C-alpha cells in the first residue's frame, strides 16, 4: 500500500497529525504544524482520508501524507453506517501499521471522521493523544477521540461542560488555531492584488471552502446596492460558477469593476481580510476566528440545524453575544435585512461597526497555534 513507502524514514522526534474530511479540520492543523516547526526540529506526518481533498491540501503545506480508508457515522439511519463500520476497522488497522512504523512521540487530532481510527490505534500503542475541538459543542468524532486522549484542547472556555466530569481535568482552553499568515497580514498587499483604491470600503463575502449557494443568492439579490457602496470580494465556491456569472451579468458595465469573484481564496485571504471593513460569512469556526485575529466585524449567516448539527449557530451566537458580529438567518432570502443592516452600520453617525471591530479583536487576542504546539512539546520532551 502507498503509505508503506512514506513511513520508511526514521527520526529521533516525530509527531503524527490527523484530521480531515473538510478544510475546517485541516487548516487549523496546518497552523499548529507551522507553529511547531518554529519551535523544534520535528518530523510531522499527517494521516488523512485516502479519498478526497485531504492529500492535496496537506502536501501543498509541505507535510508528509499517509492516506487511510475512512468511514463516517451519520446521525440518521442509513445503510451506509453498516458498511462504514468496516471502513473504520480497516482504517484502524492501517493507522496501527503506520504508527507502529513511525513510533511518534504524540498524535495530534484535529477532528473529523477520519481522525477516529488513528486515535484508537495510538491508544492501543500507548502513544499520547492530544485532540482539539474548534466548535463550542464537540462533534461526534471529538467525543469519541476524547475517550482515548491524554489532553483535550478546546476553543471556548465553557466547552469543557460537554465532556464527562471524569475527563474535565484533561481539558484545556487554547482558542482556535489560525495560520501564521494572519498575524503578518497587510492590507496594502490586498489593494495591490485586487487593483483597487480605498475610495470605497471593502466588503468580503466568504461561503466556506465549498461555497454557500444561499449566501450567493443574497449577494445576487442586492448586488447593485453592494457594488455601489462597496468594493466586493466574493468567494463563491467551486461548483457555483453559475451564480457568479448571474451576479456579474446583473451588474452594469461600470459596476463590474467593483465585483471581484473567486471560487476559493487561500494564499491572499489574510491580506484581503486585513483590508476588509466588514466580512459577510458562514459561521464556521475557522472563518470567525480568522476574522477575530484581524479584529474584523462580521455579519454571520450560520448553517441552520437542518443542514448541520447546529455548531455554526452556536459559534455565531457566541461572537454576537460578545459584540463582534451580527446574525442574519435564512429568513432573509431577498437580502432586505442585509441591505438595511449595512446601511445602518456604515452610516456616518453610527459607531457600532468600530465597536464590533474592537470586540472582535479582543476575542482574537492570543496565538492558539503556538499554545497547542507548546502542549505538544511537553510530550515530545517526555518521549525523548
UniProtKB/Swiss-Prot annotation:
It catalyses: di-trans,octa-cis-undecaprenyl diphospho-N-acetyl-alpha-D-muramoyl-L-alanyl-D-glutamyl-meso-2,6-diaminopimeloyl-D-alanyl-D-alanine + UDP-N-acetyl-alpha-D-glucosamine = di-trans,octa-cis-undecaprenyl diphospho-[N-acetyl-alpha-D-glucosaminyl-(1->4)]-N-acetyl-alpha-D-muramoyl-L-alanyl-D-glutamyl-meso-2,6-diaminopimeloyl-D-alanyl-D-alanine + UDP + H(+). Gene3D superfamilies: Glycogen Phosphorylase B. Pathway: Cell wall biogenesis; peptidoglycan biosynthesis. It is a peripheral membrane protein. It comes from the Bacteria. One of its GO terms (molecular function) is UDP-N-acetyl-D-glucosamine:N-acetylmuramoyl-L-alanyl-D-glutamyl-meso-2,6-diaminopimelyl-D-alanyl-D-alanine-diphosphoundecaprenol 4-beta-N-acetylglucosaminlytransferase activity. NCBIfam families: murG. GO terms for cellular component: plasma membrane. The keyword Signal does not apply. Disulfide bonds: none annotated. InterPro entries: GlcNAc_MurG, Glyco_trans_28_C, GlycoTrans_28_N. Its EC number is 2.4.1.227. This is UDP-N-acetylglucosamine--N-acetylmuramyl-(pentapeptide) pyrophosphoryl-undecaprenol N-acetylglucosamine transferase. Coiled coil: none annotated. UDP-N-acetyl-alpha-D-glucosamine binds at residues 22-24, 179, 209, 312. Belongs to the glycosyltransferase 28 family. MurG subfamily. It is found in: Cell inner membrane. The keyword Ribonucleoprotein does not apply. Cell wall formation. Catalyzes the transfer of a GlcNAc subunit on undecaprenyl-pyrophosphoryl-MurNAc-pentapeptide (lipid intermediate I) to form undecaprenyl-pyrophosphoryl-MurNAc-(pentapeptide)GlcNAc (lipid intermediate II). One of its GO terms (biological process) is regulation of cell shape.
